[in-house]
Every structure is written in structure tokens, then in C-alpha cells.
Amino acid sequence: MLTTPSFTLGIEEEYLLVHPETGDLVGRAPESLLPAMRSKLGDQVTREFLQCQVEVGTRVCQTLAEAREELSYLRQTVAEVASEHDLAVIASSTHPFAEFDQQMITDKSRYASLEADLQHVARRLLISGMHVHVGVEDDDARIDLMSQVTYILPHLLALSTSSPFWRSGETGLMSYRICIWDEMPRTGLPSDFESWSEYLRHVQTLVDAGIVEDASKIWWDLRPSCRFPTLEMRISDLCTTLEDALCI
């Protein structure tokens, strides 16, 4: 029997680290920064692909009010710790004038592998986003809901946009981040599947062909999480305000 989904919420956000006086991105984050953040947030804060980024993630939230409290605390704490290191944090999906080829990639095997595989396409990823996990415990229900929700993904992107500038220029687009991201393989709207088993066969075909190691390398705008029984919405820009993030 199909069980009613819990529709729990989990929100992940990626922030940019800048010098408060100039707004310039940090070339290399201070070694003490992440330990200081983790002393207050534990594993809710992690490094990201570039040294100038940090990522936070809420705990599993049962209500929107709980998500508001969690995300507010994460944003405030990250900003406070950054300030203690003479840095500031900005919530924006692109930096208005930074050059991507001047940024330093975080020393981590997963990121080194990504750069080795995708070269210049990966190096251009000076972008930040917001990912929202929604709890849907039944496998087939997760796939069915993915097909239904795909229709509204462009609307969510339009409501979240925060990246009109790129390399000191006005792009003419409200979300230039999505243009950068769509240069990556296996992105865009998800494929349509009739069942969880059909989705698993699709993943296994990619694995057998040597295209991906596992489902975590499928970067659709909406996907079944490979870590949790959730649907992961990945299309939106990083919202500049807490209220906008919660609205999305």
C-alpha cells in the first residue's frame, strides 16, 4: 500500500566569501575558517568546489517554521564567523565582477576528479545555488512526483533569480548561473520514467557504459537523491533573502 509522503524539508545553500571592504572574492579561505564554523554548526557546514565558497545544510525539518529557524541560524552564524576572520558572506548565484579563472579549487579528491574529467567546463563553475530536499519515502511515488513537478521548475527558477552579472558585465539574463550550469553534462530537466525500477535501469545503463560511477553524477534540475529518500530540487538560484528562500 502506498504510504503518504512525509514531505519533510531539507535546504542546502552555497555562499560566496568576500573581503568586506572591496567585495573581492577570497582567493584562499583561511585554514581556521571552516573549523571555526564547524565548532558552532558541526557537519552542517562544509567546503565547496571553490575555496571562496562554503555550503550549509539544514537538519530534516518537519515544518516551514522549523526550516525558517534552521536556515536563519545557519545564515547568521556563517556570517558572524566570517566576520571574525575579517570576511563577509554574500548570498548570490554569481559574483558581479570576479574572474572564474583566478579562483582556487578546494583540495579534495572528488573536486580534482571533476576538474580532470570536465576541464574548462568545471573551472567555470563560479556559481552558487540552493537545493531543497522533500521527503517522499515510497520509491515509485518519488518518480511519479518528479514527473509532475518538472512542469513548475522554470517558474521556481524565475522566482529565485540572483545572477544577472558575470565578469563585470550585465548578461541580459536574470539567471546567468543556469547558463553556466547547463554546460555540464547530465543537467537540465529530468528524463521521464514510469517507475522506480525504470529509473534504476537508466542509471545502471550509464554506469555500465562508463559514463558515470553512480547516480550522484546525474545533475538534473530535479532528481531522486542518492543519499536520502527525497526528491532534490536543484534548479533555483541562491536567494538573496531568507524570506525568498523560504518562499521557494
Model-derived segments and their meaning:
Residues 107, 128, 136-243:
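Loop-rich catalytic cores of soluble enzymes, especially ATP-dependent carboxylate-amine ligases
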Residues 1-121, 126-127, 213:
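Terminal catalytic/cofactor-binding subdomain
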Residues 132:
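An acidic/histidine-cluster motif and surrounding catalytic segment
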